Amino acid sequence: METKKNNSEYIPEFDKSFRHPRYWGAWLGVAAMAGIALTPPKFRDPILARLGRFAGRLGKSSRRRALINLSLCFPERSEAEREAIVDEMFATAPQAMAMMAELAIRGPEKIQPRVDWQGLEIIEEMRRNNEKVIFLVPHGWAVDIPAMLMASQGQKMAAMFHNQGNPVFDYVWNTVRRRFGGRLHARNDGIKPFIQSVRQGYWGYYLPDQDHGPEHSEFVDFFATYKATLPAIGRLMKVCRARVVPLFPIYDGKTHRLTIQVRPPMDDLLEADDHTIARRMNEEVEIFVGPRPEQYTWILKLLKTRKPGEIQPYKRKDLYPIK
C-alpha cells in the first residue's frame, strides 16, 4: 500500500493485511532474497545465474518478448547468439537484484569497493556548480542502484515508479528504493510532481524506453528497427532548467562488480525538434546497450506501437510461437 505525502510524494507503508496467509509466499521470497544478499557474491552469483537461466526457460512469454525484440533490433546476429543474450539477461537479473538488496541491508560502505564509476567527474562538476540534473537511464536490471548510491552520499534524488502487482513486493521494493532517502512519484499521478521535485533541487531519474503509444511519440530509429519514442526529456530539461545526463549501470556476474557509465550532458537537445530529441534518446540507449545487451530488460514490450498498417510484433503468430 502507498501513502501520499505532500500531495506528490509516495511513501511505502506497511498494511496489516500483509500479515494474511495469502502473502506468506511473498514474504518467504523476500526473506530468501535477504538471505541471498548476505551471502558473499562470489558464492551467490554463480547460483543466481543458473537459477536465472532456468527461470528464463520456464517464463515462455517473457522469453518470447525478449527474442522478438532482439530479432528486430539485431537481425544480423544468429539465432544462437540471440538465445545466448536472453540466457545471460536472465542470469544478470537476479544478480543485480541481489546487489540492490545487499546495498539496502548492509549499506553502501560494503559495496562501494565493488563499484566503478566511469565519468564520475561529470557528476562531481554538476554538484560543485549546484546544477539541476535529470539522468537519462535506460532500463537495465541494476537501474536503481546508482540512484541509491547517490542518495546515500547525501544527494537528493527523485524518480517515477510503477506499482508492482503484488502489494507486499511493491511495499518492499519501494522501501528499498527509499532506503537512503529521496522521493518516489507514481506514474499514474502524472509528470508534474516529478517536475516539482527537480525544480526544488532533487536530481531526477528518467527511464526513456517505455512505449507510450503513438499520440505524442515520434517514430525514430532504434537499433535496426524503429520505436515509438516519447521526446518528453526535451520539454523536461527546459521546464526544469536541468541538464540531461545519460547514465547506465552494468553488473558483471563474473567479477561481481558494478560499473556505472556516465556520458556527457545532452545540451544539444535544447534547440532540437521532437524528432531529433527522440532519436538522440534512442541513440544514447544504443551506445550503452549495444556492447552489453544482456544488461537490458528486453522482456518489456518496447516495440508495441507500430506504424499504421503494421501488426504489433508480439501479436504475430509467426514469431517465436510458444509450444
From Swiss-Prot:
Pathway field: Glycolipid biosynthesis; KDO(2)-lipid A biosynthesis; KDO(2)-lipid A from CMP-3-deoxy-D-manno-octulosonate and lipid IV(A): step 4/4; Bacterial outer membrane biogenesis; lipopolysaccharide biosynthesis
UniProt membrane topology term: Single-pass membrane protein
Gene Ontology MF: a single term: acyltransferase activity
A single Gene Ontology CC term: plasma membrane
Transmembrane segments: 23-43
Pfam families xref list: Lip_A_acyltrans (PF03279)
Keyword Acyltransferase: yes
Disrupted gene: phenotype observed: Makes pentaacylated lipid A rather than the usual hexaacylated lipid A.
Localization in the cell: Cell inner membrane
E.C. number(s) listed in UniProt: 2.3.1.243
Record GO biological process: glycolipid biosynthetic process; Kdo2-lipid A biosynthetic process; lipopolysaccharide biosynthetic process
Positions occupied by motif HXXXXD motif: 139-144
Alphabetical UniProt keywords: Acyltransferase, Cell inner membrane, Cell membrane, Lipopolysaccharide biosynthesis, Membrane, Transferase, Transmembrane, Transmembrane helix
Catalysed reactions, as listed in the record: alpha-Kdo-(2->4)-alpha-Kdo-(2->6)-(dodecanoyl)-lipid IVA (E. coli) + tetradecanoyl-[ACP] = alpha-Kdo-(2->4)-alpha-Kdo-(2->6)-lipid A (E. coli) + holo-[ACP]; (9Z)-hexadecenoyl-(Kdo)2-lipid IVA (E. coli) + tetradecanoyl-[ACP] = ((9Z)-hexadecenoyl-tetradecanoyl)-(Kdo)2-lipid A + holo-[ACP]
Recorded family membership: Belongs to the LpxL/LpxM/LpxP family. LpxM subfamily.
Function comment: Catalyzes the transfer of myristate from myristoyl-[acyl-carrier-protein] (ACP) to Kdo(2)-(lauroyl)-lipid IV(A) to form Kdo(2)-lipid A. Can probably also catalyze the transfer of myristate to Kdo(2)-(palmitoleoyl)-lipid IV(A) to form the cold-adapted Kdo(2)-lipid A. In vitro, can acylate Kdo(2)-lipid IV(A), but acylation of (KDO)2-(lauroyl)-lipid IV(A) is about 100 times faster. In vitro, can use lauroyl-ACP but displays a slight kinetic preference for myristoyl-ACP.
Protein name: Lipid A biosynthesis myristoyltransferase
High-level lineage: Bacteria, Pseudomonadati, Pseudomonadota, Gammaproteobacteria, Enterobacterales
